[in-house]
């Protein structure tokens, strides 16, 4: 079984000394049947005075670092080794009642899924509704897995990948209008489109790898950095992973770190500092994914 090694380094530089506030890091994957952690490491420079671990509302592992004193830099290096046991698309088994659109979740599931089923972004002219419903009509029989595969492929084929360093995400209608976006934007577009069909979805933050291309200087779109994709809840199959940036289904090339109801809740690093208004100089991010 392949062992994956991930190293994620984030560096902040400041022109003048600043005082660091609390920083929250979503960097440690959860052990599960599909991802077994072997070891993990978190190195912080300057060292934090207090480092504690908590589970957020979604069950993600969050490191909370506190600091004293001033500094002109902050380096956060997270690394882990893990074995990956991804689901293959052909292994997905959906309950009979959910094999075709339309269907409804059971009463208990509907309550527990809560706001993950609800639309979060404005669609006053029902443009996204029409876009999603058209996919259902185009798929013979309206099979659930087939519609979601078509949606994943449509985003990959019709929209142009355009990485953005800016924080946040584009609204789904903006991504459709521009015809381009980052992996975060594509993930959010698919989340909201699936919610148009009554499905529960979650935003996933993690890493992308292609074992065949590691070390070859090329890879899937979005590799070499943090990556974003989607989980859709399907009765019988559970939370199924879809990457619309690369038209991937089932998680073979996806290393999940955290999940959230909305992209704003899944930042790998968030924090603050106190200092002069022009103190911030630069930020750099480096991600290495290798196998052993």
In which residue ranges do the predicted regions lie?
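Intrinsically disordered, low-complexity N-terminal segments that are enriched in acidic
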Residues: 1-105
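Short capping/connector residues at structural and topological boundaries
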Residues: 19, 23, 49, 72, ...
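A general structural signal for short secondary-structure boundary/capping elements
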Residues: 55-58, 71-73, 124-127, 273-292
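Hydrophobic/aromatic-rich core segments of domains that either
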Residues: 138, 153, 185-273
